[in-house]
Each structure stands twice: as structure tokens, then as C-alpha cells.
Amino acid sequence: MKLSELKTGGMGTVTRVAGDARFVSRVTSIGITEGCPIEVVQNAKKRPILVFERDSLIAISRKDCDLIDVEERR
């Protein structure tokens, strides 16, 4: 499932970061890597998605979230 599909309060584990080398480098530099836990703090329509990962609160565009695959945790 894509990160953009997780609902507010949803938690998951990153399974893949797709995209070109520049995007992958940018995302990994802020700590989003395969295997890291991630929580969606806010997922409002047509707005960037606010996520919490590794003690940081990060806003990510919907377009970028579509390139990040996660496995939902319950």
C-alpha cells in the first residue's frame, strides 16, 4: 500500500522507496528508509501528509507519498 493510503493515526513500516536517485536520496536523508516505522499524524484531502518517524514530524507531498510503499501495522 502507498503511504498516501494510510489514514490519520495509521501506522506502518516502510517497505520500499521508489523514484529517481534524487528523490530516494532526499527521502533517505530525512530518515525515511526501508524498515523504518512511520505514523500518519494527519491525512487531509488535497493537503500534504504529516508523518511522525524517528522522533521527527515531517510534511510530505501526496505525490511523494505515492512513491513510498508501506506495510500497515495494527
Kindly label every feature range from the protein language model.
Residues 34-40:
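Conserved beta-strand/loop element in small beta-rich adapter and peptidoglycan-binding domains
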